[in-house]
Amino acid sequence: MILNWRKVIVSFLVIILTNFYNISFTHAESYKWEQIPLNTDEILLDIGFVPDQPQRGWLLGTRSTLFETTDKGKTWELRSLNLEDDKYRLNSISFSGKEGWVTGKPAILLHTTDGGSSWSRIPLSNQLPGDPALITALGTGKAELATDIGAIYRTENSGQTWKAQIQEPLGVIRTVARSENGSYVAVSAKGNFYSTWKEGDDKWISHPRQSSRRIQSMGFTNNNRLWMLTRGGQLWFSSNDSFDEPNWEGPKTPEGKVGFGLGLLNLAFKTPTEIWVSGGSGILLSSQDTGNTWKKETSTDNIPSNFYKISFIDKEVGFVLGNQGTLLRYVSL
């Protein structure tokens, strides 16, 4: 009798695991991603390309790390900014034409008008609330700056003067993102709640988190709706683009439904329907149907790195940024 029960249990487990791996962890083609060697062990934080020079791009990281590529990311050369020391955590880069901006902490702002051949440092006021966290180039001489406590400023004269966009900052935040239409979403330091702001508002609007799980990061879809990654590997999408009263679709679980999660950290859309999610311990997942089914990328299993950021510069080329100088390049074959 005991033996029969053991057979039933074993058969049941086999069925569950087989269905789980077939549905949630179907392996993606491993040849799509390649690791690019870099002469650094620093954490890589952001990447940006020059629209007027599409082969040219820049890669940022901790300890003032700056790399340049002229072949669309196949190879990279370390560049020096000639700063007084290497203490800066360069965390955001953005270009419009050949004009570009780089921010970092402690507070630093760099500006270029020639695609990065030369960089000039723009002084920031000691009264700036917080340190720069996100920079967005908006056109000739125009940019928008968000700090790590939710202050937002805009310049229209190449950084000579800045105008505050909100009356008061939000408080310490863990992540901040900007949509194509100029709206922002920020996650509180502990992930307990998130806040939104759109142009014309005089303050942030705070919202409770959607589930009992703390928020890891948030951002915007291609149609300016919200996405949310929570602890334990859940992914949420808003069903509308209303910031005042966002509605949320049921959670998706890219890593499966067995009850574990390695920690999902960032998300990027390659196309309107193809999504890639990166996370800790070399986890990389993709969906071809806007998150309904997922595949696990196996070529990154043995890379000892957390994948902090994933970014696609077009439909053919994308990058994953991690710690210990880890850089992956996506090539559409």
UniProtKB/Swiss-Prot annotation:
Disulfide bonds: none annotated. Pfam families: PSII_BNR. Keywords: Cyanelle, Photosynthesis, Photosystem II, Plastid, Signal, Thylakoid. SUPFAM superfamilies: Oligoxyloglucan reducing end-specific cellobiohydrolase (SSF110296). Transmembrane segments: none annotated. The keyword Thylakoid applies. GO terms for biological process: photosynthesis. GO terms for cellular component: cyanelle thylakoid lumen; photosystem II. Residues 1-28 form the signal peptide. PANTHER family: PHOTOSYSTEM II STABILITY/ASSEMBLY FACTOR HCF136, CHLOROPLASTIC, PHOTOSYSTEM II STABILITY_ASSEMBLY FACTOR HCF136, CHLOROPLASTIC. A 7-bladed beta-propeller torus, about 55 by 55 Angstroms, with a depth of about 25 Angstroms and a central pore. Belongs to the Ycf48 family. Essential for photosystem II (PSII) biogenesis; required for assembly of an early intermediate in PSII assembly that includes D2 (psbD) and cytochrome b559. This is Photosystem II assembly protein Ycf48. It comes from Cyanophora paradoxa.
